[in-house]
């Protein structure tokens, strides 16, 4: 059964008092229409008292206000400090700024991380855009050359005997005499330090003693360095105008091979080609030659330093390869090791073309010259005709040579003919024919003759039934 609903009795009319007030006879006060702004203004003027509850700020709001004030104060203080620092940098002398940067307590920089000495080079190659565009290394790759290695160079005793006639003024023991007179990296640095000490006494632009102390300590660290970070003072070394004097203070002749590798990477990536060339010339090349002379092989990290130096191919050719060929005392082992770096790394054709041109213009013959020419020819570059003409003139130059030429010379000529036989003119082939008559090898000369005279020439075609007079010499 459902619940009973109570009936609510509503009033049939308003109370009597309300009816009297609303009656027409009652007095009504006229209503004034006041705007909201005027009404609020009137209330504020009439409010003479102060409500104590409205004067108290809540704790949360007060905390927020204080935090904002504190942040604004910190920002103002930071801006003031920046302005003061800029003013100090403008007013302080350059020597004082330099001593501050070279503070020994700030040697290790936590911002930049250097890779370990044995880390792969792929990450470094990905930053190719940081290099100079003139070096042509935007597509550089630290992998095996796409042109092929060119084969292993064999060195026999007979070849060494013949080559010794072209070294040391024509004597049989010229190679040993050259090793006795060649200065090591330590000897060079000792002489440079003595010159620096003599200039330090009389020169007005002497190096700050604090800077000398810093880089002396840097050299001590590099004597035991194997991997990890390098001192910050050494990383900013290439930025100074007198970087070479500061470099000698670190004694590069006592560095570990790991230090040589890291320093080569630093100079190749953070400096221009001219500074890189100077560093390779005074540090890397003497150190590589000393290591080969002592151990009859090259340390792995020094070999990797040579590969790193090819980030700057122009600097590599000017500081390492060409000076070796021009020196006249480059051993076959040195040429073989350094030439293998050229074979394994892809190098822009323009730099290699200039190097071949310079090698072909050398008047003093050395076995290293033939080895370098052979290795560069085996890379199968599309050489300009001017370079090919220069190489032809290089081999024709030996027409007046009365001494027996080594096998390396014949192999270099064979490699050149195999790669560029169609780019040689008919007149140039006739000149080479005369050379083949005078300087003959019982195996290689026949192969050169077959490649040279049974192929197309530049501007013409060789006869199919061509016979050469040098065939009688092979019998």
From Swiss-Prot:
Q: Name one GO biological process term.
A: rRNA processing
Q: Which GO terms describe its molecular function?
A: snoRNA binding
Subcellular location, in the record's words? Nucleus, Nucleolus
What keywords sit in the KW lines? Nucleus, Ribosome biogenesis
Residue ranges of region Disordered?
Answer: 1-57, 106-149
> Could you tell me where the Acidic residues compositional bias lies?
45-54, 107-119
> What InterPro entries does its record include?
Bystin
GO cellular component terms, semicolon-separated = cytoplasm; nucleolus; preribosome, small subunit precursor
- Bias type Basic residues, positions: 1-12, 29-41
Q: Which domain of life is it from?
A: Eukaryota
Xref: PANTHER family = BYSTIN
Function recorded in the entry: Required for processing of 20S pre-rRNA precursor and biogenesis of 40S ribosomal subunits.
Which family is it part of?
Answer: Belongs to the bystin family.
> What protein name is recorded for this chain?
Bystin
Name the source organism: Dictyostelium discoideum (Social amoeba)
